[in-house]
Regions:
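Acidic active-site catalytic centers that drive phospho-/nucleotidyl reactions
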Residues: 111, 115, 134-135, 151-154, ...
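DPxDG-like acidic metal-binding loop motif
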Residues: 142-203, 207
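An extended, acidic
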Residues: 3-4, 213-381
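Residue-level signal for inorganic ion chemistry
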Residues: 84, 88, 111, 122, ...
Length: 381
C-alpha cells in the first residue's frame, strides 16, 4: 500500500529511516517541522537529477579549477576572506568613518582596509592573477585565467548600523566560472559579534565551519521563507521587484530583505531559506555565493531563466525544487515512484512568476547585457 503526502512535507520520510541509508557526515537537517535525516545521494538518483536539470539550468561552476590544486586554491581563498574579516572584526564596535559613493550607497574606511588586507594575501600567493575588487577595481594581468572577485564588506550599511547581516566575500573564477569561494558572515550583534565561515570548491561541495551543508528539501512556495534585495536606482527594475516582493509575501511564509547578497545566498546553501533573487548585482556580490548554493545542491539561473554567469545583471538561486515546476518535480515523481510513494505536485514555482516579469523589463529596453567583465579577460561564458 502506497503512502500519500503533500510535496514539501517531510514527516513520512522519518518512517523510512530504517530502510534508507543516511549520511554519516551530515545526518540531520533542520526543517520547520523538526530535524530530519538527510538521504545520501546514490549514483542513480544523482544521474536522474543531473539529467533533468543540466539542460534547463547549466552548472555555473568551473568544470576545472585549472593547474592550481583545489586544496591549495581554497586554502588561499579562505585565508584571504579570514584576513579581511579580522580587519572588520577589529572595527565592528568602533565609530565609523562613513563616506558616500551615491546618495545612499555607503563606504567606510573598513571597506578599504579589508580589501587592502585581502589583496595582500592574494598577491603574496598568486601575483600573476587578475583581481576585481569592489573598491579598487581591476588590478593585475588580464591574460590570467584566474579572476578574483572581492567584496571586502558586503552589507556596508548594515555594518555601519551594527545590524547583523554583513560579510567578507571572496570568490575566484577560472576562465569566467566560479572555482573556489569563501564567505565570512558576521553573526550576533553589538558587543557579542562572532563569525562563521562558508567555503566551496567546484565539484567539492559546500561547507560551513568545516561541516558539509545542503539546501532545504521544501518544494512548495507556500511553505518557504524567501529573500530578495533592492538596488539603489528606483527605476522599472526596482518597481518590478517591489511587485514581486508583494506577490511572494502573499503566497509564502515571508520574504526578507537583509541587504547582503553573499549572506543571502549562503543562507540558501545552508537550508534556512529556500531562494533568493535580485537585479543588478555585481560580480563581487555573486561570485562566491552562487558557487556555495550550487555546491550545496541548489540551482542558479538568471531571473528570466537563462544560463547564468557572474557578469549577468540578474540572479535567482534556490534549493532547486522551487526553481521551476516541470523538471524538478519530474525527478521527484520518478524517485518517489521507486519508493512506492504517491506524490502531490504543487502549484507553479518561482520562475513561473519571476521569469515573465523579467521578460517585460527586457521588452521595455532595460539593459541586461553582461557588465563589469574586465577588458580582454578570457571567459568561457
Amino acid at each position: 500500500m502506497s503512502t500519500v503526502f503533500s510535496a514539501g512535507t517531510l514527516s513520512p520520510l522519518r518512517s523510512l529511516s530504517s530502510t534508507l541509508k543516511f549520511s554519516d557526515v551530515y545526518p540531520f537537517k533542520f526543517h520547520p517541522n523538526g530535524y530530519h535525516p538527510i538521504l545520501s545521494k546514490s549514483r542513480s538518483q544523482s544521474l536522474i537529477a543531473n539529467s533533468l536539470l543540466s539542460d534547463k539550468f547549466p552548472t555555473v561552476a568551473a568544470p576545472s579549477v585549472g593547474p592550481i590544486p583545489p586544496s591549495q586554491l581554497i586554502e588561499v581563498v579562505k585565508t584571504a576572506a579570514n584576513t579581511g574579516a579580522q580587519v572588520v572584526m577589529e572595527a565592528v564596535n568602533k565609530p565609523r568613518n562613513i563616506t558616500y559613493k551615491g546618495s545612499t550607497d555607503l563606504v567606510t574606511e573598513t571597506d578599504k582596509m579589508s580589501e587592502a588586507a585581502i589583496l595582500e594575501v592574494v598577491k603574496k600567493n598568486f601575483d600573476d592573477h587578475l583581481i576585481l575588487g569592489e573598491e579598487g577595481g581591476v588590478i593585475g594581468d588580464t591574460a590570467s585565467d584566474y579572476l578574483w572577485c572581492i567584496d571586502p564588506l558586503d552589507g556596508t550599511t548594515n555594518f555601519a548600523h551594527g545590524y547583523p547581516s554583513f560579510a567578507v566575500s571572496v570568490g575566484v573564477l577560472y576562465r569566467g566560472k566560479p572555482a573556489a569561494a569563501a564567505v565570512v558572515e558576521f553573526v550576533g550583534g553589538p558587543m557579542c559579534w562572532n563569525t562563521r565561515l562558508f567555503s566551496a570548491t567546484a565539484g567539492g561541495g559546500a561547507f560551513c565551519n568545516g561541516q558539509r551543508i545542503q539546501v532545504s528539501a521544501t518544494n512548495q512556495v507556500e511553505q518557504c521563507l524567501l529573500v530578495t534585495g533592492f538596488g539603489y536606482d528606483h527605476d522599472d527594475a526596482w518597481a518590478t521587484n517591489i511587485d514581486l516582493f508583494k506577490e511572494f509575501t502573499d503566497v509564502s511564509r515571508g520574504v526578507r530583505r537583509l541587504g547582503a547578497a553573499a549572506v543571502d545566498m549562503c543562507h540558501v546553501a545552508l537550508g534556512i531559506v529556500e531562494a533568493y533573487w535580485e537585479y543588478r548585482l555585481k560580480p563581487w556580490d555573486m561570485a562566491a555565493g552562487v558557487l556555495m548554493v550550487e555546491e550545496a545542491g541548489g540551482t542558479v539561473s538568471r531571473m528570466d531563466g537563462g544560463k547564468f554567469c557572474v557578469f549577468d545583471r540578474s540572479v535567482l538561486v534556490s534549493n532547486g525544487l522551487l526553481h521551476t515546476e516541470n523538471e524538478v518535480n519530474e525527478f521527484y515523481r520518478l524517485l518517489l515512484t521507486q519508493m512506492k510513494i504517491r506524490f502531490f505536485v504543487p502549484a507553479p514555482q518561482l520562475l513561473n512568476r519571476i521569469g515573465p516579469a523579467t521578460e517585460k523589463l527586457k521588452n521595455k529596453g532595460i539593459d541586461f547585457s553582461l557588465w563589469y567583465k574586465p577588458e580582454n579577460y578570457r571567459a568561457d561564458v
